[in-house]
Amino acid sequence: MIFGGIKSMEKIYFIGINGIGMSGLAKIMKCKGYDVKGADICTNYVTEELLSMGIVVYNEHDEENVKGADYVIASTAIKESNPELSYAKNNGIEILKRGELLAKLLNRETGIAVAGTHGKTTTSSMLSAVMLSKDPTIVVGGILPEIKSNAKPGKSEYFIAEADESDNSFLFMNPKYAVITNIDADHLDVHGNLDNIKKSFIKFICHTQKEAIICLDCENLKEVVTRLPEEKTVTTYSIKDESANIFAKNIKIEDRKTIFELYINKELIGEFSLNIPGEHNIQNSLPVIYLAFKFGVSKEEIQEALNKFKGSKRRYDVLFDKELENGYGNKTKRVRIVDDYAHHPTEIKATLKAIKSIDTSRLVAIFQPHRYSRVHFLLDEFKDAFVNVDKVILLPIYAAGEKNEFNISSEELKEHINHNNVEVMNEWKDIKRYVSRVKKDSTYIFMGAGDISTLAHEIAEELEGMSE
């Protein structure tokens, strides 16, 4: 039985080991003394760290790789036809879902699980950064600059992790504390409708052993709170509703910093500031500060950590920010390239609003829609997602393994976006050419959960060459 004592270097095999969630667990299990191997057909920035830790990573799926494994870990994205998964089933190897393994780790500790349709990576990363002095175990869905990784084993009782609602795997968890940032319509191909998503979150909150910290700025969560059993301990937070237990007011922006006063149960705790823009990030910071105080982190430590926190990789990730000659009378232009994971309409709108609040330059959103099913189900919600930009460029939809059963395209999405300057560009070379010809100060934000980050990095590298 896993965690029943390591016997002769028990062997764990991860199918899809380079994924952001799978790789974090692989690192933790390696540090716990397990013999860890895995396979993934996609090589990325995570692979090098896994190899440096002595983890064997195969670049193809083959049943020979799995032979001798005591356990196989697979995410729900792995198809039943996968040869490694088939071999494990046919040979009696214990198979765990990624979410099951994460829950087994977290449930044994003072687990703090961060859930929500949007903001869970930023919130869990921010909490991890603020709690570093307490030496927590960390498993988050992005690369946290403070630890240069998405995972870190800790020696204390604290375990900070994201809770994934997309496939209901967060229902394996029984955390001591839970943070719920919001609920929105997403992954409808799995859940069917919004009410089913709410029911899943209610179950998750009921699994929480001590305290659930819930955002009242989300109307869906407000309703969920009314449907919870009376015996559940709930603490609320808000930047709009002063009845919340944790409340931020007197919000202002100075020198690209967001400053606010924090009140807990009507008592002024003090003034705090963030170096990442947007009201949604103030919301994200409120449960972080509250929990850090609860676990004994000083106000000075909290503020210092918040000042240093720049977000995790692919969350408002500035890749390039320099002045370049524009070729017209040797005048200079300031060009900023930003990489961001936002792919749901709500995330896109919040991110672009936040950038517009601190950036006066021309703003261009270059968006790669993610999954045919998501575009189909959320088509109407994309209508006002881009109201804060000067131009929208759409790439073809990133399939993420889906078949186009809905016969939908970026051209159709273009017709639903409420903006008079939307263009579809099918080739990366066209986008590179467009960015290189800019004549005025501009910020280009590359958005999506597919491979658009690679394009953003390529353009940033080319601009670096132009600036030398």
From Swiss-Prot:
Pathway: Cell wall biogenesis; peptidoglycan biosynthesis
Keywords, ordered alphabetically: ATP-binding, Cell cycle, Cell division, Cell shape, Cell wall biogenesis/degradation, Cytoplasm, Ligase, Nucleotide-binding, Peptidoglycan synthesis
InterPro entries: Mur-like_cat_sf, Mur_ligase_C, Mur_ligase_C_dom_sf, Mur_ligase_cen, Mur_ligase_N, MurCDEF_pg_biosynth, UDP-N-AcMur_Ala_ligase_MurC
Localization annotation: Cytoplasm
Pfam families recorded: Mur_ligase (PF01225), Mur_ligase_C (PF02875), Mur_ligase_M (PF08245)
One biological process term in Gene Ontology: cell wall organization
Keyword Mitochondrion part of the UniProt annotation: no
Positions annotated to bind ATP: G116, T117, H118, G119, K120, T121, T122
Primary location class: cytoplasm
GO (cellular component) term, any one: cytoplasm
E.C. numbers: 6.3.2.8
A GO term, aspect molecular function: UDP-N-acetylmuramate-L-alanine ligase activity
Catalysed transformations (reactions): UDP-N-acetyl-alpha-D-muramate + L-alanine + ATP = UDP-N-acetyl-alpha-D-muramoyl-L-alanine + ADP + phosphate + H(+)
Record-stated family: Belongs to the MurCDEF family.
PANTHER family the record matches: UDP-N-ACETYLMURAMATE--L-ALANINE LIGASE, UDP-N-ACETYLMURAMATE--L-ALANINE LIGASE-RELATED
Role played: Cell wall formation.
Record's protein name: UDP-N-acetylmuramate--L-alanine ligase
Protein species of origin: Fusobacterium nucleatum subsp. nucleatum (strain ATCC 25586 / DSM 15643 / BCRC 10681 / CIP 101130 / JCM 8532 / KCTC 2640 / LMG 13131 / VPI 4355)
